[in-house]
Amino acid sequence: MFGWFKGRRSKETLKDRLELVLAYDRAKIAPGKVEALRNDLLEVVQKYFPSGNSKVEVEQDGDKVVLMASISIEEASLSTEEESAAEDKSDKPSA
């Protein structure tokens, strides 16, 4: 309920967020830009693999800001070349 029992203490969460803000500042990247990129990546992944459990995390690696993508690809969601070609044709407007 309200995220209180998720196992992370607010002190740890606050520390992680502060580290990310400092990393954004060092890299001269606006935090909103990284969050928008994260959301766009998730949207694209969901387009191709709608049933997979995917997440994109923003982490600090030294002085670098790193986006880590974890994409779960289920066998049933993989398309054959023929299905992909059919999808491409249906996306094109008819002349």
UniProtKB/Swiss-Prot annotation:
Residue ranges with Basic and acidic residues bias: 86-95
Keyword Cell cycle annotated: yes
GO terms classed as biological process: division septum site selection; regulation of division septum assembly
InterPro entries: MinE, MinE_sf
Record carries keyword Cell division: yes
Domain of life: Bacteria
Paired cysteines (S-S): none
Keyword terms, alphabetized: Cell cycle, Cell division
Spans annotated as Disordered: 76-95
Coiled-coil stretches noted in the UniProt entry, renumbered to this chain: none
Pfam families, per the entry: MinE (PF03776)
An annotated GO cellular component: plasma membrane
Function: Prevents the cell division inhibition by proteins MinC and MinD at internal division sites while permitting inhibition at polar sites. This ensures cell division at the proper site by restricting the formation of a division septum at the midpoint of the long axis of the cell.
NCBIfam families: minE
Family: Belongs to the MinE family.
Protein name: Cell division topological specificity factor
Organism of origin: Deinococcus radiodurans (strain ATCC 13939 / DSM 20539 / JCM 16871 / CCUG 27074 / LMG 4051 / NBRC 15346 / NCIMB 9279 / VKM B-1422 / R1)
Gene name as annotated: minE
